[in-house]
């Protein structure tokens, strides 16, 4: 049914791909539920949505919504470093067993009679045959190095993001500054 509608629009557009794409997007927004029709010019404060059941416009303001992408306003470099260190150590502690399994599966990958079918099978066989602590072997060294590395990275990222945001768009959050900051390794 969806294919028939697309083909019908293609023949009606007679070679104008912009019309086909525009009609397809409009139909997608209408069938998927409320879609974004307009915004207030990029300030991020107000968005207008149209309900599919009626033609009324609902206005939503996000001025009072909490921002989860940043630490509180008065945060200093120490808070950013602590947050980065904790996040980095936790990430390595959670992902280290998976990385251990990935390394083993990659070393056995070309063999059709490989010992492991999937990640969970590999992890259970490693724990059963070599002991519970085997997938965590070497984690202490990795976590010790991850703390300072992630602390420095996170603090540099936040400082550079704040500096670029103040230069490009004073008093607010600038997505261009965040993009530039993400492209520059610390």
UniProtKB/Swiss-Prot annotation:
Subcellular location: Mitochondrion inner membrane
GO biological process: one example: iron import into the mitochondrion
InterPro entries listed in its UniProt record: Mitochondrial_sb/sol_carrier, Mt_carrier_dom_sf
Main localization of the protein described in the UniProt heading: mitochondrion
SUPFAM superfamilies named among the record's database cross-references: Mitochondrial carrier (SSF103506)
Keywords for the protein's UniProt record, in alphabetical order: Ion transport, Iron, Iron transport, Membrane, Mitochondrion, Mitochondrion inner membrane, Transmembrane, Transmembrane helix, Transport
Solcar repeat residue numbers: 75-163
Annotated Gene Ontology cellular component terms: mitochondrial inner membrane
Pfam families documented for this protein: Mito_carr
Transmembrane helix as UniProt keyword: yes
Superkingdom classification of source: Eukaryota
PANTHER family xrefs: MITOFERRIN-1-RELATED, MITOFERRIN-2
Protein name: Mitoferrin-2B
Organism: Xenopus laevis (African clawed frog)
Gene name as annotated: slc25a28-b
